[in-house]
């Protein structure tokens, strides 16, 4: 019997970093959405605010040091780790504010996605407007968050490349 030696494909560092972000965001949603009173309030603004700030802080304190010091993150053919490592104090402060703002923006986009999905399904199924067909949960939230985050960072990288003149658009 011939034994075939198969070579496993190596998972790229970008995929590992994305999976790490997905896991961290899901964990934050689980802790904040289910473990605090913000998840039970009738006003979604509290949940959006605390999720945005919480995910932003965990990104700054946990994700960025791990992702940019362990993985080689490649965007547009360039390893972008040096953008994180070689920053001065004021640039780190701006990046911190940017990470918080981006987290808030992405959480708002995910919330609006859930709202629109539910409104569509309520109209399609003829249910009462107060019915929540698709409730928030960590897996779906983290998946939508990661998709929106990747789209926004891809767009900002394209805009940065166009601005510096190194774009192949």
Question: How would you name each of these model-derived features?
Answer:
Residues 1-78, 134-142:
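N-terminal first transmembrane alpha-helix
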Residues 9-22, 85-110:
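Loop-to-transmembrane boundary segments
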Residues 12, 16, 91-94, 98, ...:
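Residue-level detector of alpha-helical secondary structure
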Residues 31-35, 102-127:
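Alpha-helical transmembrane segments and their membrane-interface junctions
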Residues 45-53, 97-100, 116, 120-136, ...:
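Extended non-catalytic scaffold regions that mediate assembly and binding
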Residues 61-69, 108, 112, 116, ...:
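Transmembrane alpha-helix boundary/anchor motif
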Residues 69-77, 143-169:
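Cytosolic juxtamembrane helix at the C-terminal end of the final transmembrane segment
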Residues 74-90:
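Membrane-interfacial, low-structure loops and terminal tails that flank and connect transmembrane helices
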